[in-house]
């Protein structure tokens, strides 16, 4: 496992437990178990519930296993994409669960651990894979895709509305790109100096987000899973999703709104408290939405 020393702080734990309402004898599916922070909080809050935790990142799963070892009789961890959660449950002989949790985005380990390529703060290989067994890396995408396709990805997935074409052009001009700082350099060269000064966040944030989403098929996977999530829940079971940018939040909002089997519990997304943001700045962009599976034949 790569070197890593920073503690992961799960986001909006109080709100997750409030909306998920875990109870004894109930089964919770943690679709993005990550380093195990939310699962641990749920298990501590509910001494009789059980967690099935899944993640595509084998490295964070090892961290979760260590963090949750005292609950080993009530937690089962699997290296599986949440889009395949229905097949996993079937394999385990579980027809439905009582709660589903999704904490989308990048974990602290993925950002701060060495050589994952998610960060623009230091030089690392251009990887960005959450599943290290996947063949598609950021380096492959940036060096092989046509300029027009790169511009589309940066425009759509990074919401880089004004400068996507300029950034894509600089990426192509700077090929081959091998490290995260190579990508930062290309973005810096593409943006006017006034735009770099104007931005509140790092000027390469949107481009890094776009490439990461594309490499990991994040939006496609989210859409695919949410379509079937309602059928994985027992009546009265709840789904709680924390997203970190508007693209994810829009998918969650529209899926909940269009479902005939879910009752929306959060008319507007719940945001973290000011106190939590002070203690954990990563929580700032978090948006939580929740819904409940209605009874069969219910309104």
From Swiss-Prot:
Positions bound to S-adenosyl-L-methionine: 36-38, 55, 82, 103, 110
Single GO BP term: rRNA base methylation
Biological role stated in the UniProt entry: Specifically methylates the N4 position of cytidine in position 1402 (C1402) of 16S rRNA.
Subcellular compartments: Cytoplasm
InterPro entries according to UniProt: RsmH (IPR002903), SAM-dep_MeTrfase_MraW_recog (IPR023397), SAM-dependent_MTases_sf (IPR029063)
Stretches with biased composition (Basic and acidic residues): 269-282, 289-299
GO cellular component terms, semicolon-separated: cytoplasm
Pfam families, sorted: Methyltransf_5
EC number: 2.1.1.199
Family named by the database record: Belongs to the methyltransferase superfamily. RsmH family.
Catalytic function, reaction form: cytidine(1402) in 16S rRNA + S-adenosyl-L-methionine = N(4)-methylcytidine(1402) in 16S rRNA + S-adenosyl-L-homocysteine + H(+)
Gene that produces this protein: rsmH
Superkingdom, taxonomy of origin: Bacteria
GO molecular function, one term: rRNA (cytosine-N4-)-methyltransferase activity
Descriptive protein name: Ribosomal RNA small subunit methyltransferase H
Organism for this UniProt entry: Thermotoga maritima (strain ATCC 43589 / DSM 3109 / JCM 10099 / NBRC 100826 / MSB8)
Keywords attached to this entry: Cytoplasm, Methyltransferase, rRNA processing, S-adenosyl-L-methionine, Transferase
Main EC class the enzyme belongs to: transferase
Annotated region described as Disordered, given as residue ranges: 269-299
């Amino acid at each position: 496992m790569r070197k890593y020393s920073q503690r992961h702080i799960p986001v909006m734990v109080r709100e997750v437990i409030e909306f998920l309402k875990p109870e004894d004898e109930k089964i919770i599916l943690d679709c993005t178990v990550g380093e195990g922070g939310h699962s641990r909080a749920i298990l501590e809050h509910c001494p009789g519930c059980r967690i099935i935790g899944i993640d595509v990142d084998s490295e964070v799963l090892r961290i979760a296993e260590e963090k949750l070892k005292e609950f080993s009789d009530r937690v089962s961890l699997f290296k599986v994409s949440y889009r395949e959660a229905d097949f996993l449950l079937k394999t385990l002989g579980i027809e439905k669960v009582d709660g589903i949790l999704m904490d989308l985005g990048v974990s602290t380990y993925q950002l701060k651990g060495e050589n994952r390529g998610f960060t623009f703060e230091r030089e690392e290989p251009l990887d960005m894979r959450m599943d290290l067994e996947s063949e598609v890396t950021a380096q492959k995408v940036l060096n092989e895709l046509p300029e027009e396709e790169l511009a589309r990805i940066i425009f759509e997935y990074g919401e880089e509305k004004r400068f996507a074409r300029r950034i894509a052009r600089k990426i192509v001009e700077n090929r081959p790109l091998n490290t995260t700082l190579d990508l930062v350099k290309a973005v810096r060269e593409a943006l006017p100096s006034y735009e770099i000064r104007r931005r509140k966040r790092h000027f390469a944030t949107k481009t890094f987000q776009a490439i990461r989403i594309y490499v990991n098929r994040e939006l496609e996977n989210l859409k695919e899973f949410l379509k079937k999530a309602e059928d994985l829940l027992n009546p009265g079971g709840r789904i709680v999703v924390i997203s970190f940018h508007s693209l994810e939040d829009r998918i969650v909002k529209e899926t909940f709104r269009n479902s005939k089997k879910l009752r929306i519990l959060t008319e507007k997304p719940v945001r973290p408290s000011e106190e939590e943001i002070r203690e954990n700045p990563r929580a700032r962009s978090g948006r939580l939405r929740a819904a409940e599976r209605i009874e069969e034949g219910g309104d």
